Design a protein with these regions (language model features):
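A general alpha-helix detector
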Residues: 16, 45, 83-86
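Mid-sequence acidic-hydrophobic segments that form the walls
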Residues: 20, 38, 42-45, 65, ...
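Phosphate-/nucleic-acid-contacting segments
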Residues: 56-61, 65-123
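Long cytosolic regulatory regions associated with cyclic-nucleotide signaling
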Residues: 35-42, 56, 101
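Short acidic/polar alpha-helix capping motifs at helix-coil junctions
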Residues: 12, 49-52, 64-65
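Cyclic-nucleotide recognition modules
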Residues: 1-36, 40
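Short helix-to-loop capping/linker segments positioned immediately adjacent to catalytic or ligand/cofactor-binding
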Residues: 19-26, 45-54, 72-75
Length: 123
């Protein structure tokens, strides 16, 4: 795990967390609810990443990711949370190969891109 910002790690005693306290306090319920939400979001993100990485080519991985971002944003134009190197790392591809694919997709008028802002034009 690599953090992009400074962070703190919190270790949670799962046994204590799974055992409700005597009073069944609201704070305990809220912690469990919030933790379940975080775990659920992480599970969804990991399943999406598996979907991207299961593609065979850099082009397929990239297009799968970009279409997913467009769907999530509800728009053909969207901004991704990565620079080119971070995106290449996320998709487990070489940055130079990915940049070449982006250039070809632009030439084929499938996407428009400016840094981390993309528009799905066709496809």
């Amino acid at each position: 795990v690599i953090a992009s910002d400074n962070c703190k790690i919190m270790f949670i005693d799962c046994i204590r967390l799974n055992t409700m306290c005597q009073k069944t306090c609201e704070n305990h319920k809220k912690i469990i609810y919030n933790l379940l939400g975080v775990v659920s979001e992480k599970n969804i993100a990991l399943n999406e990443k598996i979907e991207f990485l299961s593609k065979r080519t850099t082009r397929e991985k990239l297009l799968s990711y970009l279409y997913s971002c467009a769907l999530k944003s509800g728009s053909r134009t969207f901004t991704i949370p990565f620079d080119r190197q971070e995106l290449a790392d996320f998709l487990c591809v070489e940055r130079s190969a990915m940049s070449a694919v982006i250039s070809r997709l632009r030439e084929e008028n499938i996407i428009k891109s400016d840094k981390n802002r993309f528009t799905i034009v066709g496809g």
